[in-house]
């Protein structure tokens, strides 16, 4: 991701914010300090499944409008998406990844077939407008 942004969006700067996995008060202060230093930032991405937590921190700090992109169709993420606190959710289809992984393992171990080194997987982009029509997932 960083390399892509550097090569294709050179006028954009990535800013890394490290958050604690379970300390909400510290995280809120960290984000508050970040926006004091970078008040112009209006969009962000998180590469873990807890996008909803960041969305609610931003809501507490009244950072609206803010375009947040998150990962994984966890129920709290979907709720935040529907509430407009997350703009986009990426679904990596973990059940399909698991199926293809087990299939490749079986083909390699049982049938002694060579398996491809790369296996490109679909990623679905979900919004508040299309989430209710998305049927290819299970909430975790």
What residues fall within each predicted segment?
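Short beta-strand elements in bilobed, periplasmic/extracellular small-molecule ligand-binding domains
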Residues: 2-25
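Alpha-helical elements of Rossmann-like donor-binding domains used by nucleotide-donor carbohydrate transfer enzymes
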Residues: 3, 30-33, 53, 100, ...
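Short beta-strand elements at the ligand-binding edges of bilobed clamshell
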Residues: 83-95
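Short, well-ordered coil/turn elements that cap or connect secondary structure elements
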Residues: 9-11, 63, 83-84, 120
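Flexible loop/hinge segments that line or gate small-molecule binding clefts
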Residues: 74-82, 86
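A structural micro-motif
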Residues: 12-14, 66, 87
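Hydrophobic alpha-helical
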Residues: 20-76
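Hinge/cleft segment of the Venus flytrap/periplasmic-binding protein
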Residues: 5-8, 93-140
């Amino acid at each position: 991701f960083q390399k892509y942004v550097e090569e294709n969006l050179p006028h954009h700067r990535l800013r890394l914010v490290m958050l604690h996995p379970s300390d909400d008060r510290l995280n809120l202060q960290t984000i508050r300090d970040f926006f004091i230093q970078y008040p112009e930032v209006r969009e962000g991405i998180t590469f873990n499944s807890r996008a909803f937590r960041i969305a609610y921190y931003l809501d507490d700090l009244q950072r609206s409008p803010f375009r947040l992109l998150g990962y994984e169709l966890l129920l709290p993420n979907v709720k935040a998406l529907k509430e407009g606190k997350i703009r986009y959710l990426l679904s990596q289809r973990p059940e399909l990844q698991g199926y293809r992984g087990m299939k490749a393992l079986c083909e390699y171990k049982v049938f002694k077939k060579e398996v491809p080194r790369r296996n490109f997987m679909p990623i679905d982009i979900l919004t508040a407008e299309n989430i209710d029509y998305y049927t290819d997932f299970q909430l975790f």
